[in-house]
Amino acid sequence: MKPIKAVIFDMDGVLIDSEPVYLHHQYTHLKPSYPWITLESMYPLVGISGQEYMPFMAKLCRRTDDAAFRQEMDAMNAGCRVYYPDILRKEVRPLLHELKQMGLQVALASSSSRECIEQVLTQCKIRELFDCIVSGHEFTHSKPDPEIYRFTMDKLGRKPEECLIVEDSTY
């Protein structure tokens, strides 16, 4: 087995504990207009890909996935204000520093938008600890498709057997 030379992190659910915050925001926003929605019915949103999000939400809300519905969902998501240092996992900063001190490359491969990624890393003051940052919005296929990981490894100049991926998803 070759030694690990790079560590690639997911962001939501790994670096930041964002899923409960996002889920609660969406639930409290949707419940008045869609009273049949329960918090439990929204659990599949945790870890959902960008491509699956709108079809899932349309089905959940019993709506057509059209421009008006997408506008409603975009407005809801834009209204979610999070102070990311509050949800940064406490072990993240020391771990990133230790990995860098060990001479390892550190990368981020997240399904989140570039804008969201930059906001999280900047607010948490960890941006400079990453050698490579990749947004899933730059790809045709979302996770679990390995395209984002292959691209990240290529940017790092690494082979799969030289990389460790830290991900919270079960796929």
Stretch-by-stretch model annotation:
Residues 1-2, 101-104, 156-162:
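Glycine-rich phosphate-binding loop signature in dinucleotide/nucleotide-binding domains
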Residues 8, 107, 164-166:
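Conserved hydrophobic packing residues within short motifs/helices of P-loop NTPase cores
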Residues 18, 45-46, 108-109, 167-168:
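Small/polar loops that bind or transfer phosphate-bearing groups
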Residues 14, 110-112:
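Conserved phosphate-coupling serine/threonine residues in phosphotransfer and NTP-handling enzymes
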Residues 85, 113-165, 170-171:
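Substrate-recognition "cap/lid" segment bordering the active-site pocket of phosphatases
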Residues 2-98, 102:
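N-terminal helical cap/lid subdomain that shapes the substrate entry/recognition surface
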Residues 25, 107-109, 152:
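Small-residue (primarily alanine) positions within well-ordered alpha-helices
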Residues 37, 64-65, 106, 128, ...:
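Residue-level detector of short coil/turn "hinge" positions at structural boundaries
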